């Protein structure tokens, strides 16, 4: 069976941890997109010689970078940019990993909202990416205490 390839869209420490895990697990990562403040991702990507784009993926340069990689899977975690349809639509499996039990706390910093609202637990959701913000069909959810993040 032919292993599907992945382009990772990630930011911050959580994104760096996911990238390390995916690479260490032997998945075929073709490229990484991140932002300029995600130095752990930038350093790791350069160390293992993966192509990297730093900046807005919706820019002409970002779109051109993505087109260089014919990957089936888009994997997004803690990514600071909302990716437009012309980008995520070019992947067979555009997947996001989100730090709440969707549909609760869509968008950025969901764990902060869980704390503000005195939630006893939260969780993580993987879902397909669509035009809405964290509104795609849910693939998997896992509950955990709010402090697990």
Protein language model features and the residues they cover:
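One-carbon transfer enzymes
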Residues: 1-149
